[in-house]
Amino acid sequence: MEKKDLKPAGVFHYFEEICQVPRPSKKEEKIIAYLKAFGEKHKLETKVDEAGNVLIKKPATPGMENRKTVVLQSHIDMVCEKNNDVKHDFLTDPIETEIDGEWLKAKGTTLGADNGIGVATELAILADDSIEHGPIECLFTVDEETGLTGAFALKEGFMNGDILLNLDSEDEGELFIGCAGGIDSVAEFTYREVDVPAGYFCCKVQIKGLKGGHSGGDIHLGRGNANKLLNRFLSQASQKYDMYLCEIDGGNLRNAIAREAHAVIAIPDADKHALRTDLNVFAAEVEAEYAVVDPDLQFVLESEAARPKAIDKDTAKRLLQTIYAAPHGVYAMSQDIPGLVETSTNLASVKMKSGHIIRIETSQRSSTASSKQDIANMVRTVFEMGGAAVSFGDGYPGWKPNPHSEILEVAVESYKRLFGVDAKVKAIHAGLECGLFLDKYPALDMISFGPTLQGVHSPDERMLIPTVQKFWDHLLDILKIGRA
């Protein structure tokens, strides 16, 4: 199978086209310009708000003008993650895609099907006048991945739809009618620089090969967190050796489970062989623990040039102890929906910043507002006990399920008629923009669906090609039969 043969042709044409347009979160200028040019080319009413959200309107098929207006919605930014051995500039370089069996993936980077496939689907509908539908508004939001900025900034009256179809879900055959709310917590330690004594061996301890994944959709899988595993070894080593912590870095994005982390440490030269032995023993133990969910986990120890400075011992001790104690993963399962995570927390990243600051970013999610605040307060308490300054982001609301939704009834009936099986109606632990849309447009009738994606927010991201056709057929049928 070659890319030019992929079906539906229009969707994959536009997906490949937008893969040529850099669109990192908060750097969406090029894709916004692309969308404006697209609207002008097709002579469609197009507008952009102050945040950068784009709305393109398409009139109804003749005879369908009295149908309810449907908003098709996707976000235009993408998570930019790459493997360490891959050279790629997300600000300038296109995403290189390739076919692997029935899957489409990128070459060592995130694919951007989250949510590029939704964007491409909307463009294909806007460009094809043979598709039957009532009035359509295509909403393209900015910066979903790092703060839901576009959804927060959306003003009342920018769109005028009655129904909203969010195209940002990742399991074909599943219709989502609810999502978790979330909040970000940031802890900062201030440290002093101290001298590393002469005669100390300096080395880098690195963890890589973890699958990572989405901190909402994949948190229940029990995959390893590179920050937690690295910290576990460093804590062990610090108790055995006179260890200086010179550098620490792990994870990147608040909504991704950390895949890689490293630290540079210094210990007495006489202990370097024992340290390597300890790491080998530790690696064997942890690799056995994660053999099923993270079979490619690796620990690497490499010699480093001598570092003259390190984090002061007191701060380093408090940092390691606090990260060790900080919760990560599933905290509670839903009592209403079997198999749904209710509350979780993600220890996302550990970074050294200018001004002698070590910054730890975490994110908390819950379908219950009080539980979301409870788990955030738990994280805050742990870090404050360790002497860190803690701050919270604004947070965002969840989307309460409406099992009596009219558009849900249409989508369920359509799926059964097209494919002979029942669609699964679900809520999702990941955050969607839908909760914020309801704040501004409380009368909206909404569902979320999409083709099958795996490994989103990581270079393992891939899209199951046959599900794109099913998603497309289902969406067009909903637009055709949608009730007036």
Give, region by region, the residue ranges found by the protein language model:
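Short, conserved charged micro-motifs
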Residues: 65-66, 269-278, 369-375
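Acidic/His- and Gly-rich active-site-bordering loop/insert found
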Residues: 2-103
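His/Asp/Glu-rich mid-to-C-terminal helical/loop segments that flank catalytic regions of hydrolases
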Residues: 157, 223-240, 269-272, 317-324, ...
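Midchain, well-structured core segments that form catalytic/ion-binding scaffolds
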Residues: 22, 102-105, 145, 152-365
